[in-house]
């Protein structure tokens, strides 16, 4: 079980991400922005809604709207470990977080 910080102000999508991670046995804390995020094992960020840099030493998964190539590039340049389209995040939430933990 990992402590996962999910920064996603979208109530519906954030709840889906949180539910999938809890079902996989992870402890999840949701945030609307980066303020207050405190030493998680993994960071998950909605890149279209939040301007949050990855945390040093913390595996990070960012997701974006598939049409927003600029956001993907900025996240990769910022150092996110994994940057995936929102649709993939919806399908593979737990698997992506577990893969990030292996990095």
Predicted regions and their residues:
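Short, structured coil segments at secondary-structure junctions
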Residues: 24, 56, 78-80
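Active-site beta3 strand of CheY-like receiver
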Residues: 39-46
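Alpha4 helix (beta4-alpha4-beta5 surface) of REC/receiver domains from two-component response regulators
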Residues: 67-82
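A short, hydrophobic beta-strand element within the central beta-sheet of small alpha/beta folds
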Residues: 58-67
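Short, charged N-terminal beta->alpha structural module
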Residues: 1-32
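Short, polar loop motifs at secondary-structure junctions
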Residues: 11-12, 31-35, 47-51, 67-68
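Receiver (REC) domain switch/output surface
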Residues: 95-103
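Output/docking surface of receiver
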Residues: 79-91
């Amino acid at each position: 079980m990992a402590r996962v910080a999910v920064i996603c102000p979208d109530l519906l999508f954030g709840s889906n991400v949180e539910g999938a991670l809890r079902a996989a046995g992870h402890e999840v804390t949701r945030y609307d922005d980066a303020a207050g995020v405190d030493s998680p094992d993994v960071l998950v960020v909605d890149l279209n809604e939040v301007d949050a840099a990855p945390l040093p030493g913390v595996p990070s998964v960012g997701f974006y709207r598939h049409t927003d190539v600029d956001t993907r590039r900025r996240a990769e340049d910022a150092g996110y470990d994994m940057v995936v389209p929102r649709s993939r995040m919806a399908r593979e939430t737990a698997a992506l977080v577990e893969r990030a933990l292996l990095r």
